[in-house]
Amino acid sequence: MGELHSVASAVTAVAAEAAEEGGKQNNFLIPNGTFFVVLAIFLIVLAVIGTFVVPPIQKVLKAREDMVTKTAEDNRNAAEQFTAAEADYKDELAKARGAATAVRDEARAEGRGILEDMRQRANAEATAVTETAAAELARQGEVTAGELATNVDSLSRTLAERVLGVSLSEPANAGRG
């Protein structure tokens, strides 16, 4: 700051001196003192800006560039991870579908086996019941046939007596033959 103040006072002094010399004729090809003073001020301002202003700006720009580079790299990595995860997901989904299909087919086959077993049991049970019923009917038929065979003689005698009107149980009639 002190340098700028001293430079500014030097510039005003040179400007005052040039104003006093204003009466003299100046050649525009020969530089006067103001040119060198303005050049010195320009170089000082340039040095101050280069020293105090440009490095922080460059630092911020570098940090932002690094941040953008890191973000782009992170995005690229995330895209690769997403692609890999999606491929894994599709593979696992295909495996799960295959497993589900296998389980479903196995369950259907097991169901068919159980159904066939139940049919065989029902058929065997029906056959057993039919055979038991047939045996029972045959037994009852034999019993009934035996009862009828024993009762046929007495029934036929009773019927003949009623039709003929004669008693066949008498001993005289029994001798006739």
From Swiss-Prot:
The UniProt keywords, alphabetically, are: ATP synthesis, Cell membrane, CF(0), Hydrogen ion transport, Ion transport, Membrane, Transmembrane, Transmembrane helix, Transport
- Does the keyword Zinc-finger feature in the UniProt annotation? no
The record's annotation in CDD domains points to: ATP-synt_Fo_b
Please name the Pfam families in this protein's record.
ATP-synt_B (PF00430)
Q: Which GO terms describe its cellular component?
A: plasma membrane; proton-transporting ATP synthase complex
Q: Where in the cell is it found?
A: Cell membrane
User: What is a GO molecular function of this protein?
Assistant: proton-transporting ATP synthase activity, rotational mechanism
Domain of life (superkingdom): Bacteria
Main localization (coarse): membrane
- InterPro entries xrefs: ATP_synth_B-like_membr_sf, ATP_synth_b/b'su_bac/chlpt, ATP_synthase_B_chain
Regarding the membrane, this protein is recorded as: Single-pass membrane protein
Q: Which residues cross the membrane?
A: 35-55
Q: How does it assemble?
A: F-type ATPases have 2 components, F(1) - the catalytic core - and F(0) - the membrane proton channel. F(1) has five subunits: alpha(3), beta(3), gamma(1), delta(1), epsilon(1). F(0) has three main subunits: a(1), b(2) and c(10-14). The alpha and beta chains form an alternating ring which encloses part of the gamma chain. F(1) is attached to F(0) by a central stalk formed by the gamma and epsilon chains, while a peripheral stalk is formed by the delta and b chains.
Its family remark reads: Belongs to the ATPase B chain family.
Q: What does this protein do?
A: F(1)F(0) ATP synthase produces ATP from ADP in the presence of a proton or sodium gradient. F-type ATPases consist of two structural domains, F(1) containing the extramembraneous catalytic core and F(0) containing the membrane proton channel, linked together by a central stalk and a peripheral stalk. During catalysis, ATP synthesis in the catalytic domain of F(1) is coupled via a rotary mechanism of the central stalk subunits to proton translocation. Component of the F(0) channel, it forms part of the peripheral stalk, linking F(1) to F(0).
Protein name listed in UniProt: ATP synthase subunit b
